[in-house]
């Protein structure tokens, strides 16, 4: 059950990552038009997430998840049949709704299938599948662009739709619903008030997604800088990625033992240190001298996302878990959009300013979150 959810999230994010690469080449339009069309996806995901979360608390979560996967499959395939900007805009906006459906139900089902004693570790796996799928999706998109020339690019969307279809068929076959909808309507199921409990983690959570959005500008910033991608640099970046993947599992498990928010704050301070040191060392191109400081700090940074997701699942309970997990899509969409905008501006000042801006956003958010946690 949990393994399927990892695979489903991984495959779905591969699809979305590849579409991000395909879209600018598929649409014959000015850059700003393509940007607007791309923005429709996170906007519709953010707007639709809360209604979908509430629906997940009142309707079969498995069926809703399958509906989301079917929608993604149909919409992705449909884009391959048209290059009309209006049609593609509508289809891409609807894809945001289907993405919210798949993401919210996946998190809700994962929360249902886990307990306080293992939820952090499981959410670490979810975060790893999510980010790993996106990263691999960018590579898959690049491969599809090379395999299919311009006139055959529709086939790339149909191949991507096939990935979504496979994930949907797996859901219908293997997905088990830990909590039935009739159980949620029983009088003994307590309706928890989660507003005051969820508020303290929001500042760090939003800051984290904004920083992630700014990271989307790093490939261009690296290309514009004088930093050479030597063998040593690639090894350094590879170790960073491996440590982040390992840390998501390790710190998720640690949070099962000593508490979510404590691990989250420690991870946020680790990320702050990484942003400052890496940004400071980039202009002189001597960041490899500090690799034994940068690696452990980036390792700590991997603690933030899984502990927040586990914390939300902990405090929401069965009855409101769908509504609470809707915040995932809302915060992620808003944060990525803001991060893309800020990153676009600061990247022109130099690659180091992406990291300085991230630190400038993260530090006050840590202070606010820590203050709110102490006042609870």
Predicted stretch roles:
Residues 1-42, 200, 208-226:
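Helix-loop boundary and gating motifs at the non-cytosolic
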Residues 162-183, 366-373:
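C-terminal membrane-cytosol helix-exit motif in multi-pass small-molecule transporters
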Residues 42-50, 134-135, 241-249, 336-337:
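Residue-level signature of mid-helix packing/kink "hotspots" within the transmembrane helices
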Residues 70-83, 270-284:
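C-terminal ends and interior cores of transmembrane alpha-helices
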Residues 176-203:
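Juxtamembrane intracellular "pre-TM" segments in multi-pass secondary transporters
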Residues 10, 87-101, 289-303:
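Hydrophobic core of transmembrane alpha-helices in multi-pass small-molecule transporters
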Residues 93-129, 310-311:
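Cytoplasmic helix-loop-helix junction between adjacent transmembrane helices
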């Amino acid at each position: 059950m949990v393994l399927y959810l990892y695979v489903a999230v991984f495959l779905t994010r591969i699809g979305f990552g590849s579409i991000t690469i395909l879209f600018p080449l598929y649409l014959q339009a000015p850059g700003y038009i393509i940007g607007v069309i791309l923005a429709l996806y996170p906007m519709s995901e953010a707007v639709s997430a809360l209604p979908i979360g509430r629906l997940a608390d009142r309707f079969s979560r498995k069926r809703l998840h399958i509906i989301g996967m079917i929608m993604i499959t149909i919409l992705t395939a449909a884009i391959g049949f048209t290059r009309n900007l209006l049609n593609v805009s509508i289809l891409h906006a609807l894809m945001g709704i289907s993405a919210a459906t798949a993401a919210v139900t996946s998190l809700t089902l994962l929360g249902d299938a886990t307990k306080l004693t293992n939820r952090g570790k499981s959410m670490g796996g979810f975060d790893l599948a999510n980010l790993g799928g996106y990263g691999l999706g960018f590579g898959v998109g690049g491969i599809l662009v090379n395999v299919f020339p311009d006139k055959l690019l529709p086939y790339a969307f149909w191949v991507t739709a096939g990935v979504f279809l496979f994930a949907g068929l797996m859901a219908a076959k293997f997905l088990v619903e830990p909590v039935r909808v009739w159980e949620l309507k029983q009088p003994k199921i307590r309706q928890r008030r989660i507003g005051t409990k969820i508020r303290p983690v929001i500042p760090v959570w939003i800051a984290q997604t904004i920083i992630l959005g700014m990271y989307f500008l790093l490939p261009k910033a690296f290309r514009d800088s004088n930093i050479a991608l030597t063998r040593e640099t690639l090894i350094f970046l590879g170790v960073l990625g491996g440590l982040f993947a390992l840390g998501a599992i390790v710190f998720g498990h640690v949070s099962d033992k000593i508490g979510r928010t404590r691990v989250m704050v420690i991870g946020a301070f680790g990320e702050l240190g990484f942003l400052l040191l890496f940004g400071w060392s980039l202009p002189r191109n001597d960041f490899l001298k500090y690799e034994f400081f940068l690696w452990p700090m980036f390792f700590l940074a991997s603690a933030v996302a899984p502990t927040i997701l586990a914390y939300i699942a902990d405090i929401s309970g069965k009855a409101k878990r769908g509504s609470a997990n809707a915040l995932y899509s809302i915060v992620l969409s808003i944060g990525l959009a803001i991060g893309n905008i800020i990153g676009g501006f600061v990247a022109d000042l130099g690659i180091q300013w992406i990291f300085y801006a991230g630190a400038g956003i993260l530090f006050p958010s840590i202070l606010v979150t820590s203050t709110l946690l102490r006042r609870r």
